Amino acid sequence: MTERVVLAYSGGLDTSVAIGWIGAETGAEVVALAVDVGQGGEDLEAIRQRALTCGAVESIVVDARTEFAESFVAPAIRSNALYMDRYPLISSLSRPIIVKHLVEAAREHGADAIAHGCTGKGNDQVRFEVGVSALAPGLKVLAPVRDSGMTRDKAIAFAEERGLPIDVSKRSPYSIDQNLWGRTAECGILEDPWAQPPEDVFVYSADPTVARTPDEVTISFTDGVPTGLDGRSLSLAELVAELNTRAGAHGVGRIDMIEDRLVGIKSREIYECPAAITLLTAHRDLEDLTLERDVARFKRGVDQRWGEIVYDGLWYSPLKAALDAFVDAASAGVDGDVRLRLAGGVAQVVGRRSPGSLYDHALATYDAGDQFDQGDARGFIELWGLPTKVWAAREQRLNP
């Protein structure tokens, strides 16, 4: 029986060429799988047909936008996920859902291997292969671009030789990856960390320096997950899409950073994530209102580690499962509304409210009606500072 390989297919040059390369090098049949995570661009039916024309025995398109939002983006929001305190894990979140569908397709079609089009310098090769190892340890993984030394020129020559329906006449100066949660750009002039990004690199966001009439949005949350916008109940996928448009119109979510890649090198990355930055800003603010102080402090460390392990390709790991359990418990009761002003590249919180608010006006106010007994402060300070006071007395005794 002829072996089968399920290929993570994007419709671009590298993965289109990979179909023929896998057949030529291994003799295996290729099942192409394209997963829609809200990346937009070319029609997915056209991509499906291209895979068949390039030699795939079967070509599958999976609409995973809702699943991506509810099962991958929502946990990231609840975990305030920002790698290096800045990057909202745009690509990192989409890889594990693609891996999930690759493994499911491999089982359904009797494949004993999966393949991806990643290079050997990026993080995605790790995310794909470690994810497959976690979900299906017996599956082999092929990486044609990395393992065959397939340069762009070689790929073009391969495509032309076989008459593959790939337009290679137009080449973006940037390497782009995008999905519902945002857009990433690298390569070209962006590889110079001193060079200012040209405006043509930005698609999801308008120039934040151009004055516009500010917009105001109110985001509703239930147990830490966004559920409504301006009083309208929306699915998370719908809500993210609308915020990408509205916040993006004010230049919100542009990030220019030097990033520590998992493989050990630093890279310059340009991100556009209007909805992500708006939602993460709102969620963190609502947590400040609703979480008990020690839970909030501890959760900041959990959030940071959660972002790191997801960036590092460990979505399907026991540590992430354990952290998820804590985040689930901490998020219960993170309900309410956050109002934000969108202007000049910033999503600024201007109001928040919650039925579970821990803000007590009678304790916080300095005006009439203050119920805070300031006389209690003296005893509290004495006990709080007692260890320091005892230590200082010892130091003075030993070191007069």
Swiss-Prot record:
Its EC number is 6.3.4.5. It comes from the Bacteria. The keyword Amino-acid biosynthesis applies. It is found in: Cytoplasm. Its main location: cytoplasm. GO terms for biological process: argininosuccinate metabolic process; L-arginine biosynthetic process; urea cycle. PROSITE patterns: ARGININOSUCCIN_SYN_1, ARGININOSUCCIN_SYN_2. InterPro entries: Arginosuc_syn_C (IPR048268), Arginosuc_syn_N (IPR048267), Arginosuc_synth (IPR001518), Arginosuc_synth_CS (IPR018223), Arginosuc_synth_type_1_subfam (IPR023434), AS_cat/multimer_dom_body (IPR024074), Rossmann-like_a/b/a_fold (IPR014729). GO terms for molecular function: argininosuccinate synthase activity; ATP binding. L-aspartate binds at residues 119, 123-124. Homotetramer. This is Argininosuccinate synthase. It comes from Frankia alni (strain DSM 45986 / CECT 9034 / ACN14a).
